[in-house]
UniProtKB/Swiss-Prot annotation:
Family per record: Belongs to the small GTPase superfamily. Rho family.
Record-level GO BP terms: actin cytoskeleton organization; actin filament organization; bone resorption; cell population proliferation; cell projection assembly; chemotaxis; erythrocyte enucleation; G protein-coupled receptor signaling pathway
Lipid tethering residues (S-geranylgeranyl cysteine): 189
Enzyme Commission designation: 3.6.5.2
Organism: Mus musculus (Mouse)
Role played: Plasma membrane-associated small GTPase which cycles between an active GTP-bound and inactive GDP-bound state. In its active state, binds to a variety of effector proteins to regulate cellular responses, such as secretory processes, phagocytose of apoptotic cells and epithelial cell polarization. Regulatory subunit of the phagocyte NADPH oxidase complex that mediates the transfer of electrons from cytosolic NADPH to O2 to produce the superoxide anion (O2(-)).
In-chain residues carrying the UniProt-annotated modification Cysteine methyl ester: 189
Name of the molecule in the record: Ras-related C3 botulinum toxin substrate 2
Protein residues bound to GTP: 10-17, 57-61, 115-118
Motif range (Effector region): 32-40
Transmembrane segment boundaries: none
């Protein structure tokens, strides 16, 4: 059985841990708990192929900037996450996460993931953003960013409702099993 290492990165509180817990346990966790990182392992079938999917959670907080890259070697695919209701986390994909991942892993495939899809149409959330002269991130904005960072795919999901959740991980596996030729041939990350 092929083993695939998938590392999840993004700003603190965008829902990385909830994404992983909801996917692996089919249950949405309670309160927000910042993570250093937890590893999950799941045997899954994608396109009739059995895969051992190793899921690596990371801490988005700046305190962990020096520690986080220790989980990057031998990564097969990255999920760079941002919250659809946090424009700052969206901007940080370009400003921080993409450069960090590419610095350590120049040719590992990336999937861009917009989280908290259930809140994009939530009246209270929209109102809070409007008070700060902000708005939720739209699907076309997500697609444009994915193109800018040469992401294999752009996907949106909700860990709460599980809408689009399984697709995120299926596509992460497909990005490794059926690599798309890009400007550079993709290969697992290694630190020299």
């Amino acid at each position: 059985m092929q083993a695939i290492k998938c590392v999840v990165v993004g700003d603190g509180a965008v829902g990385k841990t909830c994404l992983l817990i909801s996917y692996t346990t089919n249950a949405f966790p309670g309160e927000y708990i910042p993570t250093v990182f937890d590893n999950y392992s799941a045997n899954v079938m994608v396109d009739s192929k059995p895969v051992n999917l190793g899921l690596w959670d990371t801490a988005g907080q700046e305190d962990y900037d020096r520690l986080r890259p220790l989980s990057y070697p031998q990564t097969d695919v990255f999920l760079i996450c941002f919250s659809l209701v946090s424009p700052a986390s969206y901007e940080n994909v370009r400003a921080k996460w993409f450069p960090e991942v590419r610095h350590h892993c120049p040719s590992t495939p990336i999937i861009l993931v917009g989280t908290k899809l259930d809140l994009r149409d939530d009246k209270d959330t929209i109102e809070k953003l409007k008070e700060k002269k902000l708005a939720p991130i739209t699907y076309p904005q997500g697609l444009a960013l994915a193109k800018d960072i040469d992401s294999v795919k752009y996907l949106e999901c909700s860990a709460l409702t599980q809408r689009g959740l399984k697709t995120v991980f299926d596509e992460a596996i497909r990005a490794v099993l059926c690599p798309q030729p890009t400007r550079q041939q993709k290969r697992p990350c290694s630190l020299l």
